[in-house]
Amino acid sequence: MANQPIILNVYDMYWINEYTSSLGIGVFHSGIQVYGREFAYGGHPYPFSGVFEISPGDSTELGDTFKFKEAIALGSTDFTENDIEKIIEELGKEYKGNAYHLMHKNCNHFSSALSEILCGKEIPRWVNRLAYFSTCVPFLQSCLPKEWLTPAALQSSISQELQDELEEAEDAAASASTSTTAMPRPGRHTKL
């Protein structure tokens, strides 16, 4: 098994950190890098996975409000790339887009959960300090721009998922109409 490094990529969110960092509160997005891929989580209004993948450290894929800040080595893992695909798929069931919450289930919570699975370590506390602060100031989430909750890279994943669902529905409707018009032949058996 490979001993793959686990990297936390941290991104500054917009210009606000110029003002809030002196207060000890930053607004950060994060993702976990492993096997040359970066996995992150963002919110959207649909009941499917909010987990998405970008090129490691590429803030342009996240959108204009993000700027790469730093990469932090968290540890290493012996999970294979195939194992990680399965882990991401399972986490996607828990981290659905419509379950995103700034205080309780955000990108940094996802990064911490994935890091704990892969190398047994949480992310540094300062990365998610805004979530704690938000519990003290509950209206804060409603003051944040929508694009902070749904990164641009996630928008393409959402579009693809919605397109796939539409195609599946069209295929199901087409096969339902075909099966009602086709008469079964007596005496024929189909092997499964």
Swiss-Prot record:
Per the record, the similarity remark reads: Belongs to the DeSI family.
Main location (coarse class): cytoplasm
Keywords (A to Z) from UniProt: Cytoplasm, Hydrolase, Protease, Ubl conjugation pathway
- Recorded superkingdom: Eukaryota
Q: Which reaction does it catalyse?
A: Thiol-dependent hydrolysis of ester, thioester, amide, peptide and isopeptide bonds formed by the C-terminal Gly of ubiquitin (a 76-residue protein attached to proteins as an intracellular targeting signal); S-hexadecanoyl-L-cysteinyl-[protein] + H2O = L-cysteinyl-[protein] + hexadecanoate + H(+)
Report the GO molecular function annotations.
cysteine-type deubiquitinase activity; deubiquitinase activity; long-chain fatty acyl-CoA hydrolase activity; palmitoyl-(protein) hydrolase activity
Q: What do the Gene Ontology cellular component annotations say? A: cytoplasm
Origin species, per record, is: Xenopus laevis (African clawed frog)
According to UniProt, the name of this protein is: Deubiquitinase DESI2
